Amino acid sequence: MNVLVLDLETTVDRFDGKIDGSPFNPKNKCVSAHYRWQGKDGVTNLVFNHNEKLISDSIEILRTALARADVLVAHNAKFDCLWLTEMGLTLPPLIRCTMINEYILSKGQRRPLSLKATAERRDVTRKRSDLVDDLFKGGTGFEEMPLGVVLEYAEADVISCAEIYEQQLEELSLTENQSLNSVVEFMNEMLVFLLEIERNGIKVDLDALEVVKLELQNEHALLSRRLRDIVESVMGDSPINLNSGRDMTKVVYSREVSDRQLHIDVWNIGLQPNGKPKYPPRMKKAEFAKAVRDTTKIAYKTDALCCSDCNGTGKIQKYKTLTRQKNGKKYRVAGEAYKNPSKCKTCAGLGAIYHPTGQIAGLRLNPLSPSFASVNGFKTDKGTIALLISQAKGKGNDIAVEFLEKISRLNALSTYLDSFVKGLETWTRKDGILHSSFNQCITATGRLSSSNPNFQNQPKRGFPVRKAVTSRFQGGMFYEFDFSSVEFRVAGAVSRDRQVIDDVLNDKDIHKQTASIIHQIPADQVTKDQRQSCKLHSFAPLFGSMGNGLAAHEKKYYDEFFVIYKDIGKYQQRLMNGVLRNGIVASPSGRQYFWPNVERLRNGRVTNATQIVNYPIQGLAADLVQLSCIRAYKAIKSAGLNSLLVLTVHDSICLDVYPGEEEQVKTIIYDAMTGVGDEAKTRWDYDFPLPLEIEATAGKNWFDQHDIVLT
């Protein structure tokens, strides 16, 4: 086989502190291409856009090389392939990305995957970053650097990549790594699908986005005002910053850290030598309560009195002192004022003196376990707030429920505005198309991540920013096809749990069952709101959660789950025991996850238990979704449709559907997604015993969608 190892150097556009190297930015150009044939010496250099090169090399030379190649090898190959396709070049039949290979061979261990880091780890020819780093920092691009420097730098990249690829092939040939070869093939096929959706991009209606932005900003302002009112009512005049963990501890838990170092020591806060967080201490209920009292003190409401020294400004104007002499005696007088006022020492720059009233401040909620401890007191992150809302409802603490629900919504709105609205505004090109960037090598499980913006981090339903995502075709529609409860089906499949299989085949409403157990009522009496509020618990045990820290009625569900689904519990125990024996967990699709230092705990579980039981399920679910993407891509191309694959988010595939192709698209995508079980047998020799259910919606935009019937 003819294996071509390639590296491209391109210009980048710098704006608003960002660096954009995308081929979709019209300001960017391919400076040069560099390649060599595997097994042969010498690197071919082609220069297209460089200040020292008055006559560009012919792109036809590169076209000929690509046509001759059976395999294209590159590090972060998707970047190079995007540039090649946007330059009008045809890719070889097979792509092999050495970054993807290194990710797979890392077996879930977090390692730096850059070419430089990989070369150093494998002790091959080093990337010559020293040649260009200072130039880059100074704002000099490849097109402006001395051409000799560019060529030396790029040649080292090509040689390094070729040597890495050879080592990876040797490693993949080892007996213990045989299953990884199918993952290499699969992930490099998925790379081609990602090329397709990144090139197609999504159509963004910037006018609609502006309307959504104003709506979100207005809601944010209203919530902020109401939260300030609540804080004032429970904290008195104490100045509170809702973005401060220290202040939020006062508001939510009515406590503040009394001795920071003692707090850190008692709660074992910090990082282990491997960079992972330390484990919280194990404590009985009485020990935990005493530790809370020992490390924190009660926060009290305050009354504020205007500081008389600075008249409430928090600043003191000081003057330079001048020395004068009269009749032989020296004396001092005030000179001109210093340029900047000084902070008032009396009030510490606050402008007021705060006197405790003796009345306990805050919402008086309780941390539920040692895992709630943080360096600034106790946690108030998204997951913790969800648990505290349940506690507040159980206590009938209505003001706490309102505060927590509103602060949770405020945080969500801030994310919507800062990440998504701003992201769409920043990265949508002048033609109205946004080309998001997808990464296969970030999550430990194999799930995709994306950036510019991160579509994988958006809510699954009711997300108003989706109103701005529409069809580019006159009369076109935006379609989304979504796997239903894929992780639950995967868990039932890998554990062969009879009850899961029966529930799936009988179309049982699992979320209604969850609410029935939590609220201790018959399933037919569960309300829509109760079902919705309990959905977050339904599949949490699949991913290693034991319900620790939850209210008693919610914790009951986690205990009951493993009574109902006994074989899932047995499967999880087999995984933990297997890791203790050999340090490896494998998924049916061939992925391997490595935990070298797992130990048995006193409760029968093991260290890293959450990840050990989570990764194989998440990994297989991710692979089934991505396999459906590959199948959809091949089918759409084979049918020669005008409709475009544009996104995959969570467990779904999104398309921009051309008018008149609706029925064809429905049939193709339905077959692609429901057929992954059969293809799993062909690819991975794995019998998937459950049908996969697909839900589909369509609309003029991604938000205003209606259900569509699939056959």
Segments and roles (model prediction):
Residues 5-6, 74-75, 96-99, 472-486, ...:
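Conserved catalytic palm subdomain of right-hand nucleotidyl-transferase polymerases, strongest
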Residues 660-667:
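Short, conserved charged micro-motifs
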Residues 199, 302, 306-318, 325, ...:
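Conserved catalytic core of nucleic-acid polymerases
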Residues 78-89, 102-106, 249-256, 484-498, ...:
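Short active-site loop/helix that positions an aromatic residue
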Residues 671-683:
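A common structural junction motif
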Residues 1-16, 27, 32, 126, ...:
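Conserved "right-hand" nucleotidyltransferase catalytic core of DNA-directed polymerases
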